[in-house]
Amino acid sequence: MALLQISEPGMAPAPHQRRLAVGIDLGTTNSLVAAVRNSVPEVLPDEAGRALLPSVVRYLEKGGRRIGHEAKEQAATDPRNTIVSVKRFMGRGKAEVEGAANAPYEFIDAPGMVQIRTIDGVKSPVEVSAEILATLRYRAEDTLGDELVGAVITVPAYFDEAQRQATKDAARLAGLNVLRLLNEPTAAAIAYGLDNAAEGLYAVYDLGGGTFDLSILKLTKGVFEVLAAGGDSALGGDDFDHLLFGHVLAQAGIDAKALAPEDVRLLLDRVRVLKEALSSAPQASLDVTLSNGTRLVQTISHDTFASLVEPLVQRTLTPTRKALRDAQVTPADIKGVVLVGGATRMPVIRDAVAKYFGQPPLVNLDPDQVVALGAAIQADLLAGNRGGGDDWLLLDVIPLSLGVETMGGLVEKIIPRNSTIPIARAQEFTTFKDGQTAMAIHVVQGERELVADCRSLARFELRGIPPMTAGAARIRVTYQVDADGLLSVFAREQHSGVEASVVVKPSYGLADDDIAKMLEDSFKTAEIDMRARALREAQVEAQRMIEATQAALAADGELLDDAERTQVDALVAALRTIAQGDDADAIETATKALADGTDEFAARRMDKSIKRALSGRRLDEI
């Protein structure tokens, strides 16, 4: 009789008792999902074994779409409907979107946040991001075998309130419960700190496809304290691509405005390949033919590239110096520099970091995966899956100051930048006029002194103030930032007790009604999505069956007579043909036919294996 096993007290819960939570790195160029499995964080690949999901969504007629690799492959042939680098547009108006001039999209300057016209209608960056997040959610649930209780989603440390709220709304649209929005450098520090039991001061240099962050962290016995954060939410690997794109066109004497959208996307894709090639070679070549027949052939040396992008490299060092000053440390005080983001693979970046900090950066974890791995560890903790002795404390900070408008359009800072979160701060204000019975509270974010130079987050009114002489009323305004970096503001008149409050949802044009409509639209297209998903799953299973059968025939084909071999070959050929179509039921039927048709062959192979294993052995040896 088999003995049942009972785990030791304090051991990890059984799989069916674990609450499934994941970490998601929603990136500009690529996105990933990771989970803790058997106490080890690991990135979850797709059915083809690919860890990275290109952050690309292609919209088709009648509600269809392609996401990830399939969409990326069609970007050059259908650029207007294939959205790439959407993270750069999150929470941003058209005027704020850098690189928009080279983008082949038809932008619509909606209130607060830019939108994009596609063949399937106008799409907001939130909707596009939701498609990517939903794909990662499905991948995780398929791999882990159950529904998720939630996810930790990483955001650039320098994302402002509007961008953070947009990310949270995208997750909501994707059907994800957000356990925490975690700053990307902090996630990387978790992965490194727990893996290496590191202590001391560390800098996390995070250069992704569309954003740059630099955080200074102090790691001490399970405490991750962010001392300072700086960055640029509109600087990333895409900018290096656009600079090289402009150089190639200038060398050829071509005006970018004269290019067709298809040529813009094609050339940007080829330029990115060229940039990546220069990371491992002294020079690389570009050979591309445009839609009008013009052929561009150029060879770029690494030295030329390094000289070209030097201004961008220096742009990353400016917030680096600022963060060090804010943390009151010098480069010599830094024990290690962690590189995060695919763009940090460029030698010009690694050389600049090594020169500035006086030491080679840490690169023993994949810069593309380290953020997702750290997020997975944090998600596992928040889901309650880690033991009591396996806790750690995150002390993150807000990247930009939060303030209120005062008379004259001035900003009074309530919570200064680099304040540890969660946090609550209060300040008292008074009335400006005699008999004033209401006060307008205007919440802003930024480091400038004038409201016009800062980002407006929210407005609300406190009414019912007792009429008094100017300066007699006392209004206490409290700012409260939660662990996700999201803000609530409360105002209370001290004499009468009248109150007003607002949970800040930045005015980027996405109200609850908009989200409800998007959810309704997603329900309408759910059937299309499920059909596409079923088709893809059937095609993958068919390909697996074909490859397994061919391998078996190559190894043991002699076990079949000519008639049997002909029948199996016919079934394989039929399945291969049907799998190229779009009828999932037909593919499943053909796959089952091949499985049934090779049952006898499989049995003979099993007999052969058993005979070979037993050959030459005595009965008492078995």
From Swiss-Prot:
Keyword Nucleotide-binding annotated: yes
Give GO BP annotations, semicolon-separated: iron-sulfur cluster assembly
Q: Does the UniProt entry include the keyword DNA damage?
A: no
UniProt keywords (A-Z) are:
ATP-binding, Chaperone, Nucleotide-binding
The organism's superkingdom is given as Bacteria
MF term (GO), any: ATP hydrolysis activity
Its function? Chaperone involved in the maturation of iron-sulfur cluster-containing proteins. Has a low intrinsic ATPase activity which is markedly stimulated by HscB.
Q: What family does the entry list?
A: Belongs to the heat shock protein 70 family.
Q: What is this protein called?
A: Chaperone protein HscA homolog
